[in-house]
Amino acid sequence: MNKIICPVPLSQRPINEFNSIRNSWIISWPLLEKNIFYRKLLYSWIFITPISLIISYGSDYLRNNILDLILISLTSSLLLPILLLTRQWLSWIYIYKRLNSENIEYEESGWYDGQVWEKPIDWRAKDLLIAQHQVKPIINHLKTIFMTLQL
C-alpha cells in the first residue's frame, strides 16, 4: 500500500483543523442540539445584561428614564451573543473553505513559508464529504440565526 507523504504539518491539515474546532468550547456549540445551543446563547445574553445595565446607568439621561435604560441595556447586551455567533461563523466558514479546496496552503517556519500542496484524490473526496454533510448544515444553521437577528 502506498503511503502518501504529506509535507503539511498535522495541525494545519483541514481534517485535523475540523476535528480541533469540533472539540473546541465555543466553536462547537452549533453541533449541540438546537435547544441547548439556543440556551447557551440566551445564557450569554443574560450574563452580560447586568454589566450592560450598570454601564448604561452611568448616563444621566437613562438614569431618569427607567424604560429607556432597560431597553438600551437589553439591546446593547445582545453584542456578546452576536460576537459569539460571528466567531463561530468565521471558524466554520474557514474550515469549509479549507475542506473544499483542492490545495492545502500551509505555513511552516523556516524556508517552507507560504507553501501549497495539492491534495490527493482520496483526501479530496473525504474532505468534500465532511464539508458537505457535516460543515455545510452548521453554516446553514448559523446563517438562519443571522437572518433572524436582522429582523
Show where each model-derived region lies.
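Hydrophobic alpha-helical membrane-embedded segments
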Residues: W45-I48, D68-R98
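Membrane-interfacial hairpin junctions
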Residues: Y57-L69
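Cytosolic-side membrane-entry/anchor segment at the start of a transmembrane helix
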Residues: C6-S59
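Loop-to-transmembrane boundary segments
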Residues: L31-L42, K119-Q150
